Amino acid sequence: DVWCAHCVHLSPDDLADFADSDTGVAHCPTSNLRLGAGVAPVRDYVESGIRVGLGVDGTASNERGDLLHEVKQALLVARGRDGPGALTARGALRLGTRGGASVLGRDDLGSLEPGKRADLAIWRTDGLELGGAADLVAGLVLSAPHRVDRLVVEGEDVVRGGALVRADEADIARAHRAQAQRFAT
């Protein structure tokens, strides 16, 4: 039940140790790139049998809390490092859903199946951004960012029509900025 974040400098022996010990990796591609920390060999992780999920790493090293953006970054970084066959859009999305659940040891989430917990993020696919997309999953991943149209958590709407239902977004943003400034000083 151990997982490590980033893991951009693992040796082949480390990969074997992670796989043998069932240690997971939280891949944070945007943070790794922003900090110049290195490029995670995600394809090597997956081929070695290591559980891999995605993380946003927080606003100290990534100004976004957008997991779909991390899905896109994971796809682009993997392809930039290992070529076009390194990861598909669906494979990258899997890292952000089932992969994250697996890394956390949570088989009760990560996919839509009877008996599992189901938080849902729904994006519109009928706008100009995806008008020419032959594959809506690839289009959604590669043309990110998208504002979520509906977000359901534990069966309750949190976002509807792209707007927060039970909170004021401007108030949250102000409080977040103030807290981030306190941490920065």
Residue ranges and their predicted role:
Residues 1-64:
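Active-site core of metal-dependent hydrolases
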Residues 7-8, 79, 126, 156:
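Flexible loop residues that form catalytic
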Residues 9, 86, 163-166:
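Short, conserved sequence motifs enriched in acidic/basic residues, glycine, and aromatics
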Residues 11-12, 36-39, 86, 106-109, ...:
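Structural motif corresponding to alpha-helix initiation and N-cap regions
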Residues 37, 64-65, 134, 170:
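Short Asp/Glu-rich motifs
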Residues 43-127, 141-143:
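His/Asp/Glu-enriched, well-ordered alpha-helical/loop segment
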Residues 94-185:
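Active-site microenvironment of metallo-dependent hydrolases
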